[in-house]
């Protein structure tokens, strides 16, 4: 339910917009109907398709009447300009309303609440805890934590504490991993266990990495439900 109008409708929040995601988005919602976009960080593999969204919202049929709330790190506007090769005075005020996410703050998107938690990555980066009413029982609060890109750290464990779904990056295997950048399966599983999550979904897996290798590492530290994110996958809470 829309907390402002009291009307029942579906709210749509997108977390990150890497290459190819804008095209895939159409299978789920028209881009003009988005309620907000949240960026975990500003590396290109997590925001490269934002210019496709920008072009649509400015020039496309049914372009939005108001700017889309865009939550992200301090450098978000600068990075959007870089991707488009736009001048320094381009504000994208027709397309986006930029908000620099602050630790300890909560951001409302309809009935959903977004809370950022500091991630351990070479740039300003956040894990995102999202809470809102259950699809099946609107009186019940459900939660998801998306790690973005991070290595294991206390703030990510704190953000994931007790969530129903833990959407975790598993960027590399234990043989490949660089510290303070990504998690391997063992460390991602450790976060899931220490945070006491209900279900883990592994994502951000490299195309050359076999799933059974990831599962084997995760199972060293996590014994709960484990799935792998796939294109078009739906999880109903």
Give the positions of each predicted feature:
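Cap/insert and terminal regions of metallo-dependent hydrolase folds
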Residues: 151-236
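Binuclear metal-dependent hydrolase catalytic cores
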Residues: 1-146, 151, 156-158, 215-237
């Amino acid at each position: 339910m829309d907390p402002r109008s009291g009307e029942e409708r579906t709210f749509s929040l997108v977390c990150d917009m890497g290459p190819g995601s804008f095209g895939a988005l159409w299978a789920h919602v028209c881009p003009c109907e988005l309620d907000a976009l949240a960026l975990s960080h500003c590396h290109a593999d997590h925001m490269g398709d934002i210019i496709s969204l920008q072009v649509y919202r400015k020039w496309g049929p049914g372009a939005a009447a108001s700017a889309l709330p865009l939550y992200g790190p301090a450098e978000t506007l600068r990075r959007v300009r870089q991707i488009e090769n736009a001048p320094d005075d381009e504000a994208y005020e027709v397309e986006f309303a930029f908000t620099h996410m602050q630790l300890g703050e909560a951001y409302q998107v309809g009935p959903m609440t977004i809370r950022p938690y500091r991630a351990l990555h070479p740039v300003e980066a956040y894990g995102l805890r999202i809470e809102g009413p259950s699809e099946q029982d609107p009186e019940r609060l459900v939660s998801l934590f998306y790690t973005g890109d991070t290595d294991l750290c206390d703030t990510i464990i704190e953000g994931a504490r007790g969530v129903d779904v833990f959407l975790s990056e598993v960027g590399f295997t234990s043989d490949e991993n660089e510290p303070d950048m990504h998690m391997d399966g063992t460390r991602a599983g450790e976060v899931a266990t220490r945070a006491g999550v209900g279900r883990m979904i592994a994502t951000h897996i490299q195309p050359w990495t076999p799933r059974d290798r990831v599962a084997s590492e995760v199972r060293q530290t996590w014994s709960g439900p484990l799935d792998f994110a796939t294109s078009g996958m739906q999880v109903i809470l």
